[in-house]
């Protein structure tokens, strides 16, 4: 169950045992809810059972998530976040009715060995492809990693190739309402 304590247990107990410091290339995939603080200073992963009025106490800030992973010392860490921080569900329901309609999260710098793919801009909703019952972002990440993103047909997929494929595909299927983002080195190999 993806509760706050379950996620923290995975980050603090399981992950350090699974990672060989400075040798492991870590891949993290999260699909679920996210929410920004009212001032846009912090973005939170909102696990099962979280109270949206008490984000600091019941959710996990993205910064803490990165710090916990950094403590395990992977050689590289690649993140795929199929969530949004707009405070809406995929059916456009508001998680917290009295929140402003649009909050833009202020991006924090990330370590050089991190590569972060997100489902959309911080004030956008991460939508679903109904016909496959997956988030648009997840679906096109999977298709991209299966080879669709290999633009130059060299049998390897760079972060830049994957991002371009996912961004164009999601943009097309969302009529431009969802724009996936990437932070990090676009020349780094995601799959080789």
Name each model feature, range by range.
Residues 1-2, 157:
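Short beta->alpha linker loops
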Residues 12-20, 70-74, 142, 146-150, ...:
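Sec-exported extracytoplasmic/periplasmic mature domains
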Residues 51, 122-123, 147:
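Active-site/binding-pocket entry motifs
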Residues 77-138:
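Extracellular S/T/G-rich loop segment that most often corresponds to the catalytic His/Ser-adjacent loop
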């Amino acid at each position: 169950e993806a509760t706050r304590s379950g996620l923290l247990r995975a980050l603090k107990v399981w992950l350090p045992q699974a990672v060989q410091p400075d040798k492991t290339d870590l891949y993290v995939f999260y699909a679920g809810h996210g929410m920004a603080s009212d001032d846009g200073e912090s973005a939170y992963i909102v696990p099962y059972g979280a109270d949206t009025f008490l984000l600091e106490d019941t959710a996990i800030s993205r910064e803490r998530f990165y710090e916990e992973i950094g403590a395990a010392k992977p050689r590289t860490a690649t993140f795929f976040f199929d969530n949004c921080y707009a405070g809406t569900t995929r059916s456009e329901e508001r998680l917290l009715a009295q929140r402003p309609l649009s909050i833009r999260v202020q991006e924090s710098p990330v370590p050089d060995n991190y590569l972060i793919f997100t489902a959309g801009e911080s004030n956008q909703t991460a939508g679903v492809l109904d016909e496959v019952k997956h988030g648009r972002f997840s679906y096109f990440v999977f298709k991209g990693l299966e080879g669709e993103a290999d633009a130059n047909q060299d049998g390897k997929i760079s972060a830049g190739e994957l991002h371009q494929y996912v961004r164009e595909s999601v943009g097309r299927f969302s009529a431009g309402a969802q724009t996936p983002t990437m932070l990090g080195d676009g020349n780094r190999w995601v799959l080789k």
